[in-house]
């Protein structure tokens, strides 16, 4: 999204301190190069993750309320642990805890508006990047304490319920049998989830995987990928096919028999064959950590071009723990999914 700048003000793309510039934006002006500029008919959401300014809803190319206040939010209800979100422009009636239920409600309303046309063979596409369970971890009061574990677990339960609302709307509109639903994530679990508390109650968000969000390890990149497509994908089946989130583009294009231009989706490989039980086309995957360290996976083999996590877990980049470690890491994920034995 490209925001308009107030007359006489300047905004540098190279400035890494947002507070130096966020008040130079003219939030009353239309937003350029947003979702409506790249093919979406309607957009309702926020500008980024819920710990980033501005704190206001956006509908199509306009904010729904001017962010005239300078506020932040606790990263977690009832605790100072985790600190606060980035302070910045906030709409007067905006509350971070309202975002999840609002996006769920708006999604259900969108499905209801499209239902009649969808039943008449005019399909719709809904992309819902939820702001949860990303920080700030702020379930609404009716969900606080529900898990009996910690705020993150409460937030996960509320997120699950929001997904359930959307599936229930498809049921009510008699669209379930002809709708492809994909539930996935953009990264592995974050340490903000207080993983130790979860583990003490028998919950392990990353299972046997090493590392977490930001790392080069599988715990940072391997995420759930759940598909529901009645009549096309048998329930409770599992696939070992490698899938990258970039592959959704080519897959949807193949389903719609809509060829992609040569200069679009170059890194996208359709996984439609895998959905139908056949061998998938992707045999490799390139990923990188938050500090730009790269890894490539081919078959069971994974080569990480760094001696460390490349992210937030140990051994951290530049830490003395990396002294004497091999410059690269090689793992056989078929035998060592937890990446404990570097074969290099």
Each predicted region: which residue ranges?
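C-terminal cap/loop subdomain of S1 sulfatases and analogous C-terminal strand-loop tails that border
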Residues: 18-50, 191-195, 199-216, 233-237, ...
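The substrate-binding groove and active-site-proximal loops of carbohydrate-active enzymes
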Residues: 89-101, 145-158
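Histidine-centered active-site microenvironments of extracellular/periplasmic hydrolases
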Residues: 25-28, 35-36, 136-139, 145-155, ...
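Catalytic-adjacent loop/helix segments of enzymes that bind and process anionic phosphate/sulfate esters
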Residues: 10-26, 91-123
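Loop/turn elements at helix/coil->beta-strand transitions in domains of secreted/extracellular proteins
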Residues: 38-41, 119-126, 175-181, 222-223, ...
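Active-site His/acidic residue clusters
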Residues: 53-54, 58-62, 70, 107-154, ...
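Short glycine/proline-rich turn/loop motifs
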Residues: 81-92, 141-146, 228-232, 334-340
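Catalytic-site neighborhoods of secreted/periplasmic enzymes
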Residues: 1-89, 191, 284, 309
């Amino acid at each position: 999204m490209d925001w308009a700048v107030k007359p006489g003000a300047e905004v540098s793309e190279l400035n890494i301190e947002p507070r130096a510039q966020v008040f130079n934006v003219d939030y009353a002006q239309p937003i350029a190069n947003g979702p409506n500029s790249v093919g979406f008919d309607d957009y309702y959401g926020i500008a980024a993750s819920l710990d980033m300014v501005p704190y206001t809803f956006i509908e199509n190319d306009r904010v729904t309320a001017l962010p005239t206040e300078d506020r932040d939010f606790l990263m977690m209800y009832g605790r100072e642990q985790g600190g606060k979100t980035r302070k910045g422009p906030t709409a007067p009636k905006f509350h971070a805890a309202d975002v999840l239920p609002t996006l769920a409600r708006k999604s259900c309303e969108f499905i209801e508006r499209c239902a009649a046309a969808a039943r008449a063979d005019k399909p719709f596409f809904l992309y819902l990047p939820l702001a949860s369970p990303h920080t700030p971890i702020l379930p609404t009061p009716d969900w606080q304490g529900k898990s009996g574990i910690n705020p993150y677990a409460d937030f996960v339960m509320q997120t699950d319920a929001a997904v359930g609302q959307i599936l229930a709307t498809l049921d009510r509109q008699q669209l379930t049998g002809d709708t492809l639903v994909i539930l996935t994530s953009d990264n592995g679990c974050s340490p903000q989830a207080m993983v130790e508390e979860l583990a003490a109650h028998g919950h392990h968000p990353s299972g046997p995987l090493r590392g977490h969000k930001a790392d080069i390890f599988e715990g940072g990149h391997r995420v759930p990928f759940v598909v529901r497509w009645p009549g096309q994908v048998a329930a409770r089946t599992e696939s070992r096919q490698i899938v990258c989130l970039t592959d959704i583009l080519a897959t949807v294009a193949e389903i719609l028999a809509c060829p992609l231009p040569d200069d679009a989706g170059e890194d996208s490989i359709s996984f439609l064959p895998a959905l139908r039980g056949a061998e998938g086309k992707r045999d490799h995957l390139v990923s990188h950590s938050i500090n730009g360290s790269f890894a490539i996976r081919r078959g069971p083999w994974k080569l990480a071009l760094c001696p460390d996590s490349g992210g937030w877990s140990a051994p951290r980049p530049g830490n003395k723990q990396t002294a004497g470690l091999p410059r690269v890491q090689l793992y056989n994920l078929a035998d060592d999914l937890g990446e404990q034995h570097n074969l290099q």
